[in-house]
């Protein structure tokens, strides 16, 4: 895992997506053939160069997909939560090794199954479920592409203040966000917010101070109350 001094820039934030197109029975049958494993917070499940032969399904917790540059900078490609598949590209594009990092953001339980084993099951016991599973993966891939395009446009065309405002609204839709009488309460540090929008921690702090002065939010420590977002 990268050191605390690593520069991180984030291009996309994802909401947890509860089992797209998958009913409880399909999930149960899929999990019956998968290996369940628990991971602590901030654990690298795989890194660039590791063998690419496994599909992951997030049972609980949250993970991030990260691209690592040669100068040790990291580009966070997405946050994914329970009900989402990760590492699905290997089902469609042949690749011997991973090109990104899969890192847990919280304590996680993941279901793991090899591509080869899953393809076999699609021809046998999971044959009735194969269309639904593949459709769910396809929907997730499409949503991730749209989200990445939207976030890339923000980085290209919006200033830091606008990026922070939109990112805070994104975070208000995350499962970790809490209802507040005046809106939505978020727990996010200046450093984390800076990584989410691609600016310095100092700049993030100045923008939060300005937004508070403008009456859009209240920020204290790692707590931000975003007004009017219930």
UniProtKB/Swiss-Prot annotation:
Binding site for a nucleoside 3',5'-cyclic phosphate: 18-139
One of the Pfam families matching this protein, by short name: Crp
Summary of subunit composition and partner proteins: Homodimer.
NCBIfam families, A to Z: PRK11753.1 (NF008732)
Domain notes per entry: Binding of c-di-GMP appears to trigger the active Clp conformation into an open form or inactive state, hence abolishing its DNA-binding ability.
Major localisation: cytoplasm
Classification lineage: Bacteria, Pseudomonadati, Pseudomonadota, Gammaproteobacteria, Lysobacterales
Cellular-component GO terms for this entry: cytosol
SMART domains recorded: cNMP, HTH_CRP
Ranges in a coiled coil: none
Organism in which the protein naturally occurs: Xanthomonas oryzae pv. oryzae (strain KACC10331 / KXO85)
Organism superkingdom: Bacteria
Role description: Global transcriptional regulator that regulates virulence factors production by activating or repressing the expression of a large set of genes in diffusible signal factor (DSF) pathway.
Keyword tags: Activator, Allosteric enzyme, c-di-GMP, Cytoplasm, DNA-binding, Repressor, Transcription, Transcription regulation, Virulence
Portion annotated as DNA-binding: 190-209
Localization per record: Cytoplasm
Span of domain HTH crp-type: 158-230
The protein's name: CRP-like protein Clp
A GO term, aspect molecular function: catalytic activity
